[in-house]
UniProtKB/Swiss-Prot annotation:
Name assigned to this protein: Actin-like protein 7B
GO CC annotation terms, alphabetical: cytoplasm; cytoskeleton; nucleus
Pfam families for this protein: Actin
UniProt-annotated location(s): Cytoplasm, Cytoskeleton
Record's keyword terms, sorted: Cytoplasm, Cytoskeleton, Phosphoprotein
UniProt record similarity statement: Belongs to the actin family.
Organism: Rattus norvegicus
Keyword Electron transport found: no
Highest taxon listed in the record's lineage: Eukaryota
Amino acid sequence: MATKNNPSPKPMGTAQGDPGEAGTLPAPEAGIRDTGSTQLKAKPKKIRKIKALVIDLGSQYCKCGYAGEPRPTYFISSTVGKRSAEMAADAGDTFKETYVGHELLNMEASLKLVNPLKHGVVVDWDCIQNIWEYIFHTAMKILPEEHAVLVSDPPLSPTSNREKYAELMFETFGIPAMHVTSQALLSIYSYGKTSGLVVESGHGVSHVVPISEGDLLPGLPSRVDYAGCDLTNYLMQLLNEAGHKFSDDHLHIIEHIKKKCCYAALLPEEEMSLGLDELHVDYELPDGKVITIGQERFRCSEMLFKPSLVGSTQPGLPELTATCLDRCQGTGFKEEMAANVLLCGGCTMLDGFPERFQRELSLLCPGDSPTVAAAPERKTSVWTGGSILASLQAFQQLWVSKEEFEERGCAAIYSKC
């Protein structure tokens, strides 16, 4: 569901209004309560500004920070460590049951690692609560009841998600106001636009979402269940086939190799004909051993264009995008969408990906002349769009207050989000 009556966003740095404001709240000492028979003249209320937070919960990292800032302040792993019942019984009351963020780094006991999102959809709400508790109390060291919160929601996720977000925020954390809106909508705002075709590929899922004047075109958003984590796993497979010995325990190393050494080839067939001397790079492992990486550098990214390489029957990202463009024909928005294809998400940050994607999409849609844009900060496009939106003066009327939620329940969420 699109945010209703959203104001037009502007690129970061030109947002209207005071950054991060979410209206005002009376200070704790404001006024004197009437206790009954004695009538006391109330003191003038002191008004304090409250800074809004923006939280983008992704499959790999939860990105958070204050509205009005150009980039997130914190990147917190979306993985939660839980002790088993046996471990908890052995430890008694001396250890916590769940661990988030840096708490996972110094744990000697083995933990069950849980990711609360599967392909971008929340599957464990207890873990979401654990992550938010860590954000408020440990990372940011703030009182949640003093801050409005804007939360991003993946496209095509159940509408009940928004109700759960509201229940957690209002009932568990006591925040004064909140808003939930689509990740795709926030991504397009990061480009300073309200219309375009968002092609977003993060860690756990990829989406193609057409948006016109701030509204998601109904029935047209598409998704595929592959993204950056699948690319990482495929790179590990290719490296092992080349004689290396990596396991799931080394995925953080493979992730670093992907970011530092890999790319998408514009013409993969020509790249395959290059000699090792022209392709290879040396990479030093944490133990000091140096390995040589050759064709794996670009072969790993081919799975984004040919998902069959990793056993998926779903279409590649260019094909998914071309299909979505064709479906826009009947709505009259095809030309507008083709002129504004916007890449978002960390998986699209791979060197050479925008150029390769542009080439493949142009071959699939020769008559549409698609134009692909790739903003430098697109890895955090969802969060940045939220920061812009929550800073706009015209947006402040769209916050759902705690009082509204208590009076109207979920109807308050759906009337403004």
